[in-house]
């Protein structure tokens, strides 16, 4: 949009970011960034490779810093990379200005190695294929991938078989590292947020752990609600 198609000038993009996409012109640019710029999680090699490149820089940099076990035996010695942000993506996003993908300031970043919410538009297979391109053999601190489907989707036996085949393909053919699911509808989560007394037993998968939905901060609740609901 900026350097190839030249639909947006660098100055226009920078001003829109500083404006946090609040003015009418900034909102026009934000809409283009969200809808017209390709995103990670859709099995687009050119885009996914950018994520791989950033991960490789991160991994190589981490190797430069010995830990307290350095020189004390074969186990340990260096620090290692991981993508398990748990729910820190919410707090980290709160301290991050607007970004050139159209994300507004102070909103959550993408969690773990998951695509940004609602940006993975080509279904779960495309997400798995994008994630499989990451150098997971080097990310020994964990590779966190969150996915969400609705109970209605899994109420059909054929869909249960589809998701079983999808998961097997991810791990057996694409050499996947990790995936975890929430099986709950957006409507249920919104109702639980509005009427917590009616959903005291609602448990959700946050990241590397599960928790009662009602005990989570509203920001973390909103982040879980915003996750893409996948279809098959």
Predicted features along the sequence, with ranges:
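Acidic, glycine-enriched catalytic cores built around paired aspartates
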Residues: 1-232
């Amino acid at each position: 949009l900026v350097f190839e198609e030249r639909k947006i000038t660098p100055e226009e993009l920078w001003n829109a970011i500083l404006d946090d996409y609040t003015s009418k012109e900034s909102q026009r640019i934000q809409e283009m960034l969200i809808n017209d710029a390709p995103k990670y999680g859709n099995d687009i090699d050119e885009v996914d490779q950018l994520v791989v490149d950033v991960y490789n820089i991160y991994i190589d940099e981490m190797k430069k810093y010995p830990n307290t076990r350095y020189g004390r035996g074969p186990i340990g010695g260096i620090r290692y990379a991981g993508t398990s942000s748990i729910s820190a993506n919410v707090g980290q996003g709160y301290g991050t200005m607007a970004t050139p993908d159209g994300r507004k300031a102070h909103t959550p970043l993408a969690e773990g190695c998951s695509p940004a919410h609602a940006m993975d538009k080509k279904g779960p297979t495309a997400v798995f294929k994008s994630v499989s391109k990451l150098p997971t053999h080097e990310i020994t601190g964990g590779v966190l991938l969150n996915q969400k489907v609705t109970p209605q989707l899994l109420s059909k036996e054929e869909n249960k078989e589809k998701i079983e085949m999808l998961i097997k393909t991810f791990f057996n053919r694409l050499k996947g590292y990790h995936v975890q699911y929430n099986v709950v509808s957006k409507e249920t989560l919104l109702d639980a947020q509005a009427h917590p007394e009616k959903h005291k037993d609602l448990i959700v998968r946050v990241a590397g752990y599960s928790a009662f939905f009602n005990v989570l901060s509203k920001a973390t609740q909103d982040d879980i609600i915003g996750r893409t609901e996948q279809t098959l």
